[in-house]
Amino acid sequence: MRNMAKIGQFIYPWGNGHYSRMMRLNERLKELGDNEFHYFSKGDIYQKLLDKFPDEKQNIHEVLMPTPIDGKFGPSLAKSLWNFLLPVEGNEPLVTQISSYLKDEGKLYNKIGFDLVINDGDMGSNVLAERRNITSLFVTNQFKPKLWKSRIYFKPALEFVAKQISKASKILVADSEPPYTMCEYNLNFTKDIQEKVVYVGHFTNEKKIEKGEKGDLEKFTDE
């Protein structure tokens, strides 16, 4: 009799893209057989998980992953930079947040004992998995994206992020293989990790749409 694998899904809580991708992947994983799934996030995404899986609440865990501080039109660069070492708008310094969340996440790693972890946006989980010799998959469509000269000061941060992503056992790119890659401008993999990279296509809903009566636009274009 096959033992159930324990699979952890770590979903970065900033925006809905990470959640949407992981839920599509989760559907496919559940088609492969009975396994024990655990979900990790915070805030609105954590609540969405509770609403989506009411019978699995014991396997849904809130982890306070650090996120950028919001501004009027997306993340506030100035506030996020200040927050690296200083408290801003009720947020502890980022270095404190990272240390605290990795400790909490590490305790859950030790308690659950994963066979596989899948991380969409949560780079810290890559580090924890590597230390414990657990297979980890990192889902992304960005790796060392090219920068305009006016944004070159972001380069050290991108190098740090790339280093953490590289700790995954495999890097799953949510895009088509070259030369049909849509986000190629954002993908600049170094030679030393090319063997880890797998293009898995777009995480889209493949449900068929029933063909109904032609709409006004279709009738117009057919004329």
Feature map (PLM): residue ranges:
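Conserved nucleotide-sugar phosphate-binding/catalytic loop shared by glycosyltransferases and other
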Residues: 13, 28-96
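Nucleotide-sugar donor phosphate/pyrophosphate-binding loop at the beta->alpha transition
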Residues: 146-162
